[in-house]
């Protein structure tokens, strides 16, 4: 499974002499750490061909994993892609360097509507550029869910995944939840009728209650396996990221396997998140990192990425190059009414983060 493999676009095998040459020319290498299944790999080849810079590309599937590397320092990466809430905390911890705008001629392509929203995590957008944004919501195998719950199954509502009566029935065809407490807790709070950005003990207890009530019916907590599981018909519901579920829809259609996947941002409200590209403070090659960011901000390159991964991007100039399947899909580029229903959240402070981690461990173990 490509999600599980450690993906590298370039394997450097060289003699000691060549290795010495390479160490003298480190500016000619850039190391990027991005989410899995999150770019058109042809862009990686194109970058190497256009710039002559060797690109080493590794992947992860959890913000917590990335944050551990960022806060420890010495990751060896030149470009990383944290989600906004995590980025904010990492900027405050001194993990990133300010971008040199003089090296980012394509910055003008960026979309002011999105930059206004990302500024709450990165004031003035001085440390990062938006790569992709999306929502967290409900992916369903429409045929199986209808079979189990009937034609009026609440596939657009949090009731589908948080009402124990529904979940007990759905457990017969398989349900996956994201292994991402900062995504799942706001959804549980929304279902409980509370502010999704609350982080106090009372709110966490309410979220825990919602999750524990359906815990017996959750087959797995994982942040990437649900794509193939949905596409193959192995599960019938996933609470996950918009573009990942739409990728599952696309894979099922390509396989022509009779599986029909649909994505919905919950009508009660959905989390809107932003994945930002940033340069670590100790990046070995900040020069090459800027070259990579500028390449990504090219309108056609950014469009190619979105057309491949089914996520909206923060690049206004890319819109004319987006395929209709992407720009015309309100699950990817929401209409005004849906946008109004989307909420953003702030980072968890250290004490609350520890409470969250403890609670999440408890929920996952079901004890």
Predicted regions mapped to residue ranges:
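Extracytoplasmic ligand-binding site segments that recognize negatively charged/polar headgroups
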Residues: 81, 87, 91-217, 222-231
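Periplasmic-binding protein-like
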Residues: 204-213, 219, 257-278
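A ligand-binding cleft/hinge motif common to bilobed small-molecule-binding domains
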Residues: 86-89, 237-258
């Amino acid at each position: 499974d490509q999600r599980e493999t450690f993906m590298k676009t370039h394997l450097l095998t060289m003699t000691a002499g060549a290795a010495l040459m390479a160490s003298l020319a480190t500016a000619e290498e850039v190391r990027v750490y991005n989410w899995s299944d999150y770019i058109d790999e042809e862009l990686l080849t194109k970058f190497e061909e256009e710039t002559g810079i060797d690109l080493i590309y590794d992947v992860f599937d959890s913000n917590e994993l990335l944050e551990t590397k960022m806060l420890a320092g010495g990751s060896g990466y030149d470009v990383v892609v944290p989600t906004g809430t995590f980025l904010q905390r990492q900027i405050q911890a001194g993990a990133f360097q300010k971008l040199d705008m003089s090296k980012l001629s394509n910055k003008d392509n960026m979309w002011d509507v999105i930059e206004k929203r990302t500024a709450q995590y990165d004031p003035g957008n001085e440390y990062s550029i938006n790569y992709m944004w999306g929502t967290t919501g409900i992916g369903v195998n429409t045929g199986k869910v209808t079979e189990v719950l009937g034609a009026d199954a609440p596939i657009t509502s949090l009731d589908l995944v948080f009402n124990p009566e529904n979940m007990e029935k759905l457990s017969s065809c398989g349900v996956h939840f994201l292994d991402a407490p900062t995504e799942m807790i706001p959804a549980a709070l929304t279902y409980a009728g509370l502010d999704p950005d609350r982080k106090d003990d009372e709110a966490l207890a309410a979220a825990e209650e919602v999750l524990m009530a359906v815990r017996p019916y959750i087959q797995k907590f994982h942040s990437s396996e649900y794509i193939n599981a949905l596409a193959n018909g192995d599960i019938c519901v996933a609470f996950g990221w918009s573009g990942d579920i739409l990728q599952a829809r696309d894979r099922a259609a390509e396989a022509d396997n009779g599986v029909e996947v649909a994505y919905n941002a919950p009508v009660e409200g959905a989390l809107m998140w932003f994945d930002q590209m940033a340069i670590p403070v100790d990046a070995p090659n900040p020069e090459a990192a800027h070259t990579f960011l500028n390449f990504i901000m090219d309108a056609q390159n950014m469009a190619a990425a979105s057309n491949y991964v089914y996520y909206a991007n923060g690049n206004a100039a890319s819109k004319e190059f987006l395929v209709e399947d992407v720009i015309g899909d309100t699950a990817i580029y929401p209409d005004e009414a849906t946008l109004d229903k989307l909420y953003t959240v702030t980072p968890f402070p250290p004490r609350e983060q520890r409470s969250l981690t403890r609670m999440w461990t408890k929920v996952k173990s079901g004890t």
